[in-house]
Design a protein with these regions (language model features):
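The feature marks the mature, well-folded catalytic cores of soluble enzymes
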Residues: 1-305
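Short coil/turn segments at secondary-structure boundaries
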Residues: 137, 265-269, 397-400, 413, ...
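Gly/Ser/Thr-rich active-site loops/lids in small-molecule metabolic enzymes
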Residues: 224-243, 311-314, 341-343, 348, ...
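Ferredoxin-type iron-sulfur electron-transfer modules in oxidoreductases and energy-metabolism complexes
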Residues: 280-309, 325-443
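Short linear elements at protein peripheries
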Residues: 433-472
């Protein structure tokens, strides 16, 4: 199932009409919110962690071009081969070239949202290369031919009955059961067999340290470590914004990430990769490649306000607290990155023409901004994108691809008329008087808003009339 952002409204309606999906999400979201609240029990500590994480991300982004050059130089000095990709097509071509140069036919992949962004699995399949997900949630999603519905818990929309049905359909010899331990063991056994025969290991990167040329990988299942040590060749892929300046920047960001994502003080595994296998080492890959992807990030970087989207450390906390996402899930958005953060990232990746409906799918309640560990002002950025979807590019301001795509001459005329009306007191009083006298002619239905709400009706008298009567 591969949805499209242009179909957001019908996809959202379908999700709302699915009671099983809503029940799955409700339980998962409640659990994750409670875990985060427990992890940040002390408000003063929470604010201190968020302040420090925000400061680190802003400092690193302010030096991004220089840090990327430093990262490249230190990675090369360590023996890591660095590749640059402007877009998804270039990234996939690099992957294909590296894998085919080693005669590879099977790649095992750790969790990586950037690989989802470039649709790596499908691109490699066209080249005759099997790309198998090794994260349990990603593996379940892959079996169902779906995309992840959450950036840290890809199969959060599935319950154990649905997982068991998938295993019964796709895993030979599986005896249908709802026992969670048996389901996990089944997936683990399949994946371990694949690890033994894999030619290539693929992973994402949580933090890339410019100071030391180190790639940091956060995980809980151990599959990331297997992907980066068992195969002879390891390919890491990440967005250019993931670079940090110093090794000392990692622990504060790591603490903010784990507490915000899963409510953990620390994850089960934390991997630091600084080179291929050395002569005196017994394990690890013989080659390590790093693919640095732009794919619209430079455009966001050029805009001082939209640059804040690049602060994201992919924790998913904004999704867990969003009243829209928690009711419709991730697939309704039709984008790789769903929820609040997806609504401000996706326009840079796909253009406003394709994603114009997403910034409007928010109540602007501010919950996302209140829990963001790096204090991205998501509500303010959503309002900016709403304006840009309706307005033509302005001189001197970097324009998003597709800016003005949602512009409507009729809507523009209505707002210009409203502006004129409210700027002329005499005209406004006359129109208010007319509306109150004609209130009985108001239609009972006003589009989708009134499907489950009573249509608002003008008052019988204007405020000016009420105040005049009161002051008699």
């Amino acid at each position: 199932m591969h949805n499209k952002p242009q179909m957001f409204h019908p996809q959202a309606e379908a999700a709302l009409a699915n009671p099983e999906l809503r029940a799955n999400f409700r339980g998962a979201m409640d659990y994750l919110r409670d875990k985060r609240q427990t992890a940040f029990a002390d408000p003063d500590e929470e604010n201190a962690i968020r302040d420090r994480a925000e400061a680190i991300r802003q400092r690193c982004l302010s030096k991004l071009p220089a840090l990327l050059e430093q990262l490249e130089a230190n990675c090369i000095a360590n023996g890591i081969r660095v590749h640059w990709a402007e877009n998804a097509e270039q990234a996939n071509a690099l992957f294909a070239d590296i894998i085919q140069s080693h005669g590879g036919t099977l790649a095992v992949k750790g969790k990586s949202m950037v690989s989802e962004e470039i649709e790596l699995n499908h691109a490699m399949a066209k080249e005759g290369i099997e790309c198998l997900e090794s994260d349990m949630g990603e593996y379940i999603v892959q079996l169902g031919d779906e995309t992840p519905s959450h950036i840290i818990m890809p199969a959060i929309h599935k319950n154990k009955q649905q997982v068991a049905d998938l295993f019964a359909e796709h895993v030979p010899g599986f005896k249908h059961t709802l026992d969670v331990d048996t389901l996990i063991e089944t997936g683990r056994n399949v994946l371990r067999e694949k690890f033994r025969s894999a030619d290539i290991g693929v992973s994402g990167v949580n933090f890339a340290v410019a100071e030391t040329g180190t790639l940091c990988l956060v995980e809980n299942e151990g599959n990331g470590r297997m992907c980066t040590t068992v195969p002879e060749v390891h390919i890491a892929v990440t967005g250019i914004e993931k670079v940090v300046e110093f090794l000392a920047d990692v622990p504060p960001l790591f603490s903010a990430l784990t507490r915000s994502a899963t409510g953990q003080s620390i994850t089960t595994y934390f991997n630091m990769i600084s080179s291929p296998r050395k002569g005196d080492e017994l394990d690890g890959p013989k080659e390590v490649h790093l693919v640095l992807l732009d794919n619209g990030r430079s455009q966001a970087f050029m805009d001082e306000e939209m640059r804040k989207t690049l602060q994201c450390i992919r924790c998913g906390a904004c999704m867990n607290h969003c009243p829209v996402y928690t009711r419709i899930g991730g697939h309704a958005y039709g984008t790789v990155y769903p929820g609040p953060i997806g609504k401000i990232i996706s326009p840079h990746l796909m253009g406003l023409e394709a994603t114009q409906e997403l910034p409007t799918a928010s109540s602007l309640c501010g919950a996302c901004g209140e829990v963001c560990p790096v204090r991205i002002p998501i509500p303010e950025l959503l309002q900016r994108l709403r304006r840009e979807a309706k307005q033509d590019p302005r001189p001197g301001v970097p324009a998003l691809r597709g800016q003005g795509a949602a512009k409507s001459n009729t809507e523009a005329f209505i707002w210009r008329s409203f502006g004129l009306l409210t700027s002329k007191p005499a005209l406004y009083r006359m129109m208010s008087w007319c509306v109150t006298r004609l209130r009985g002619l108001m239609p009972s239905k006003l589009g989708p808003w009134t499907r489950c709400r009573t249509a608002p009706r003008p008052a019988a008298r204007t405020l000016r009339e009420l105040m005049a009567e009161r002051n008699k």
